[in-house]
Amino acid sequence: MKVIFLEDVKGKGKRGEVKNVSDGYAQNFLIKNGKAKAATSAAVSELKGQKKAEAKHEAEILADAEKLKTVLENDKTVVEIKAKAGKDGRLFGSIPNKQIATALEKQYKIKIDKRKIELSNPIRSMGYTNVPVKLHQKVTATIRVHVAEQ
């Protein structure tokens, strides 16, 4: 019997797959527990429509990430942060990714989750620093952060 998996079933199939399984297994376990449904022509065409909609939605998200990347990588987009520093240019403390995210939101009205800012170590010196920001699985932008003395 052909079924469409509604969720992942270990060893049998993943969500959205159409597979042939034994009749008893399909009726007594998969369909009864809501893990799959019979693969009728209407159900298969509905699945294709869902996959198209998901692909379109994913393409829109990718396009939005690309637009945001061009805005962030613009030469005029420099995140200004003021901090107390010593005479040698080293900061008292450091600038973590949370502070960069709040400064970006205040200055440019762009809200980015602090976990998407990929700062290996907090910024501890004054001057310009290039910081990578992962906007999407396939899109990574680089923003310039300028740390000035307070």
Curated annotation (Swiss-Prot):
<keyword id="KW-0687">Ribonucleoprotein</keyword>
<dbReference type="InterPro" id="IPR036935">
    <property type="entry name" value="Ribosomal_bL9_N_sf"/>
</dbReference>
<dbReference type="Pfam" id="PF03948">
    <property type="entry name" value="Ribosomal_L9_C"/>
</dbReference>
<protein>
    <recommendedName>
        <fullName>Large ribosomal subunit protein bL9</fullName>
    </recommendedName>
</protein>
<dbReference type="InterPro" id="IPR000244">
    <property type="entry name" value="Ribosomal_bL9"/>
</dbReference>
<keyword id="KW-0699">rRNA-binding</keyword>
<dbReference type="GO" id="GO:0005840">
    <property type="term" value="C:ribosome"/>
</dbReference>
<dbReference type="Pfam" id="PF01281">
    <property type="entry name" value="Ribosomal_L9_N"/>
</dbReference>
<dbReference type="InterPro" id="IPR036791">
    <property type="entry name" value="Ribosomal_bL9_C_sf"/>
</dbReference>
<dbReference type="GO" id="GO:0003735">
    <property type="term" value="F:structural constituent of ribosome"/>
</dbReference>
<dbReference type="InterPro" id="IPR020070">
    <property type="entry name" value="Ribosomal_bL9_N"/>
</dbReference>
<dbReference type="GO" id="GO:1990904">
    <property type="term" value="C:ribonucleoprotein complex"/>
</dbReference>
<keyword id="KW-0689">Ribosomal protein</keyword>
<dbReference type="InterPro" id="IPR020594">
    <property type="entry name" value="Ribosomal_bL9_bac/chp"/>
</dbReference>
<dbReference type="InterPro" id="IPR009027">
    <property type="entry name" value="Ribosomal_bL9/RNase_H1_N"/>
</dbReference>
<dbReference type="GO" id="GO:0019843">
    <property type="term" value="F:rRNA binding"/>
</dbReference>
<dbReference type="InterPro" id="IPR020069">
    <property type="entry name" value="Ribosomal_bL9_C"/>
</dbReference>
<dbReference type="GO" id="GO:0006412">
    <property type="term" value="P:translation"/>
</dbReference>
<comment type="similarity">
    <text>Belongs to the bacterial ribosomal protein bL9 family.</text>
</comment>
<keyword id="KW-0694">RNA-binding</keyword>
<comment type="function">
    <text>Binds to the 23S rRNA.</text>
</comment>
